[in-house]
Amino acid sequence: MSDDFVSFLRNNRDILCGDALASAVMRLYRLNYNNAHLAPLPEDYWQTIAQVNGICYDGAEVYGVNSPLKVFKDLITQNQNLHTSHVVVLGENETDWLVFDTGEQKYQLVDKDEESVLYSTETFENAINYILRL
């Protein structure tokens, strides 16, 4: 994720961003994630979450990682009961899920009701833009 985009998120008064994570905290969380046997996530996801641990804007949310503020939903908690080996839910808005599909190796917006793919991209930055409707 570009530094300009992180600055844009942090400097926008309407967007709530979680704090950056210390590298030791991030390593521990990734270990816990791996131990939860969830589908693997790409590096750009982890790099972003280390800089901006959760994002909320206008009814949309990108999940954080075990945020002490409890403002953001936790990635592991949100995915533990899904029982899917190739998709991880990363966030949501009122009508769509933001997921990473490991088979396609793409971030996708999926309609909550119809479960159809509405948008697909290779970068987490583009996916954030789309789910938050920026």
Where in this protein do the model-derived segments appear?
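Short aromatic-glycine-(Arg/Gly/Cys) micro-motifs in beta-strand/loop hairpins
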Residues: 105-112
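Residue-level detector of flexible, active-site-proximal loop/helix-junction positions
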Residues: 94, 114-116
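Functionally constrained cores in energy, signaling, and assembly domains
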Residues: 48, 107, 123
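Compact, glycine/acidic-enriched structural inserts
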Residues: 116-134
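Short helix/loop capping segments that flank catalytic or ligand/cofactor-binding pockets
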Residues: 98-100, 109, 118-119
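Short glycine/proline-enriched coil/turn segments at helix->beta-strand junctions
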Residues: 95, 104-105
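A surface-exposed partner-binding patch
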Residues: 1-99
